Amino acid sequence: MDKIATRRLPKIAALGMTTMTLLLGAGPGSAADDLYGTLKKINDSNTVIIGHREASSPFSYVDDHKKPVGYAMDLCAKIVDEIKAVLKKPGLTVTYVAVNPQNRIPMVMNHAVDLECGSTTNTLGRQKQVEFSSVYFTTGTRVLARKSQKAAEIEDFNGKSVGVIAGSTNERAVKAMMTAGSLKDIRIVEIKDYAEGLSAVEGNRVDAFVTDDIVLFGLIAKSSQKADLVVVGRLLTYDPYGIMMRRDDSAFRLVVNAALAAVYRSGEINRIYAKWFDPIGVPLSPIMKAGFELQALPE
């Protein structure tokens, strides 16, 4: 445990008791005195700021009505409900701010967003800057290409161009394979976001686009050229997704994980999952089912 968290321990314990009394209808006066960090920020501003992606289907994207929607957004809505209950503020304002792979971590660290609800992998390196909720999805790196490439694995793109999002776990995986010598003469093309990656493959500007396979399935589902596209190859990485938040804020993390645990415990996660993944033909895997059960912590 870090020094900051150690100093906060008495207040964290107090907040745990305060949370229960708030939910039971006790007066809010003493509760406000115990708040700190993100909960205090939200309480004082009467606003929770949600960071969302613009084209990370089916997790977090902007629909035809310019509304942020998706699997991660539905889970974050449950978290917002929990925050409202804890703070006894049912009229809490929710503000949405678009983020991208390049600015999502700085936006969280700089208090521009309180929760990043997208498709962000929880890594040990990122935990040096931010914190994550319990895992709500697991995926891994694979390859999107045109069927005409007749590729089976990423090694089939030796001597060709491969698009990657700068700073992503997928980029690191490809570059590690290049360093190891299993990928040779590949030309790396930096891609801004998922939408650009799809467009680059559709327009033959790159031979392949490498990112999380579940995102690739979502991109194909929305493509006008879906019959010509395919996801190929083995999983190159293991990528557990989490809701991103600021570090050293155990009280807020507890509220976030309590909300997710309730969704897992009640079985509501099955309905939410089916809503977003059944349409793209991705059933709930045994690994994900076990993950939800393991994280369905009792109150």
Task: Please identify what each model-predicted range represents.
Residues 103, 117-129, 173-181, 200-203, ...:
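A ligand-binding cleft/hinge motif common to bilobed small-molecule-binding domains
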Residues 54, 137-145, 213, 221-260, ...:
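Periplasmic-binding protein-like
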Residues 32-33, 169-189, 227-229, 261-299:
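Ligand-binding clefts/hinges and TM-proximal coupling segments of bilobed small-molecule sensing domains
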Residues 32-116, 266:
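Extracytoplasmic small-molecule ligand-binding "clamshell" domains
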Residues 87-100, 184-193, 233:
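Short beta-strand-to-loop elements that line the ligand-binding cleft
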Residues 33, 39, 74-82, 155, ...:
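Extended ligand-binding regions for polar small-molecule ligands
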Residues 49, 55-58, 68-85, 121, ...:
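Bilobed "Venus flytrap"/periplasmic-binding protein-like clamshell domains
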Residues 77, 88-156, 296-298:
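Acidic, polar ligand-binding/catalytic clefts
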